[in-house]
Structure formats: C-alpha cells, structure tokens
Amino acid sequence: MKTKPSAIKSLLAAALAASCLASYAAAPQKREMKFEKLRKEFADPPRAFRPAPLWVWNTRVTRADIDRMLGDFKAQGFGGAFVHPRPGLVTEYLSDEWFDLYKYSVEKGKELGLDIWIYDENSYPSGFAGGHVPAQMPESYDQGQGLALTKTALPPADAGKYFLCLKKEGGTFRDITADTGRYKDVPGEYYLYEKTYYGRSGWHGGYSYVDLLVEGVTEKFLDITMSGYEKTFGNELGPVIRGLFSDEPCIPSSGGVRWTPDLFEVFRKQWGYDLATSLPLLSEQTGDWKQVRHNYLETLTQMFVDRWAKPMSAYCDRKGMLWTGHYWEHDWPSMYQGGDNMAMYAWHQMPAIDMLFNQYNDQSPQAQFGNVRAVKELRSAANQTEIGRAHV
C-alpha cells in the first residue's frame, strides 16, 4: 500500500454509516482530555460531532420541503446533512434549479446551525455524474473494461473478432493475434480473449458506468460535477460547505478479467514483463501464477489510486474541503470491485466505511454492520497517514 508519510498523533473514533449517518471533522485544534470537558460535550456535542444523514432528494424539491426537513433534522439533534439525489428525482440534477435549491439549503443551514455537505453523484457509484461524463467523454466507457476467455482446440473462422489470441507452447503462451490464419489447421490449446463492455442502463442516464482507470475520467467528473458548485458558492467551498461524499466508486470487470486500454503498457513498465502472454495465469494455477496475480492486482490498485483517489484528494486539498465516503462494500478478501481499500483511504481527508443494514454480523468478512475488520482497516489507515484529526 502506498500512502502519505508520517503518522498522526491522535485519533477520535466515531462510526460513519453511509446508509443513513455520517460524522465529520472540525479543524485541527489543541484538545483537553479532561473528563468533565468530555462529559459536557457528550451531553451537548458541537455539530462537528453530531451525525449527519444522507438527505435524500427523490422528487420535485421545494423550498417548503427544505424548510420542513432541515427543521426536523435540527429538532432531532443532527449537525448537518449530505444532499443525496436518488432515483425518482424530478428536479434536474446539476441544473440551475438544482443549484438554486442547494444554495437555499445552505443558507437555511446557516440559520439553523447545520452544515450542508455535497454528495458528488446522482445516486451511485460516483464517477459518471448522472450520465454527463459518458455523454461528453465517450472514451470513458466505450473502450472495454474486461477480457472474456474462450478456449478452443483450433482458431475459429471468426478469430479476428478477438482482441488477443494466445497459443500454449509448453509452459508458455505465444501471442498469435496477428497471424491466426497460419494456425487454422494446427491443433493445440488456444486462449482467445474478447473485449467486454459495461452495459447501458437508465440508472446511468442511458449510458453505462465509466472506467475510472482511464486517464482523465476523474478530472472530467470533477469538472462537470463541481463547476456549478464553484460558480454558486465560490469561496464558501471549504469554510461553509465542508466537503464532499463519494459513494461506491469501483473498478469491476464487465466480464472476464479486468482490463483497461493501457493496462498492458503500465504493467510492463512496472514489472518488466508482458501481461498479455501471462493472462492465462490469472485463471490457471501454472507457472508463476502467484507472482502474476499479485503484480496484476497491485497494478490495478495503483492505477485506481493514481487516476481516481489522487485527483479527488488534490481537488479537495485545493478547495480546503474534506473528502469522505466509501468504496463498494469493502468486501475483502474479494478484490473484484477495487483492490486494496486501505490504499484508497490514505488519500481521503476524512476516510470512511459503509455500514449497511442494522443486523449485527461479526462472522462474515463481507458483513457491513458489526464488521470489526473493516473498522480496524479504516483506523489503521488513518493512523498511518498525515490526515490530521479525523473521525472515521
């Protein structure tokens, strides 16, 4: 795991529940740990220590709705809210009306002493900006995100449709993609890889989810999502709007092994050998399969860090904002959705985890509510980095 250097001196722990609650940080300050002070703050905590719900907008939002709901939040002891668009939303996402209502919410929050935070997506997973990213940047989704394997004894007549064709020769594999016709009558073991693509859906605005491993996708996402907030709030981003929440960003395969256009190039530069002719070792236990799988997963993780986490973190640093949220279910030991979650936490100003449902389960490593492992991963990442005072 590659993280920012040094360790923080202190950590206050609190649960962040992405399904309904989130706690958030105040600016670093000298703290007195006297019991009387702690007891007083437990009885009437400042808003930085109070929960903040995901405030769902899933209809036509009105100022009267905002007045009523923020009033309810204040009455129930909340410290703020994350405006969270969900399916059913009639108010157009990122429209002038959206930002007018958002600004009204922030002003009302000031009156009530509530912090209004940004949830950075139209539902989830973060990255596609409600369909605007794929609409404006086709290469964010149309190049393929997986390689599906077909094994044959002879190259098929339509071998040209495959992205990569390998022939097994002893304990190694030869790339015959450019010359499959030569082997049409040569029996053997052939490994044929075809590109797969994320499927389109209404959830993603009629497009598909985007490939966060493609360079420039995160920057496009930030430009589309945050430009309206920048125009509307200017210097209030940071001091007033404390930060933003990313929900479930992920890098799953669209079918077969996870692939992205420059994966082979990045892999060779990092490890000094060809991943293309080693792809069968990702599904078969032969040769140096353990090394190949480790190198492959480490490459995906580092690409995810470099092309998603670092740009997001840098943007929030520039704006003086806190970046929080969580990744897709952090379901270790499965690496299907994103590799090493702890490596991702290191780039958040306020790292967090999901705690779905309300049924305690300390048995399954994939459990959400009651998952001690996930909490310890999060705390360890906070302790190992220089994020300063944190609530996790």
Predicted regions span which residues?
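Aromatic-lined carbohydrate-recognition surfaces of secreted/lumenal glycan-active proteins
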Residues: I116-S123, I241-E248, L300-Y336
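Alpha-helical scaffolding within the catalytic cores
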Residues: M33-E41, D65-M69, S334-M342, F369-S380
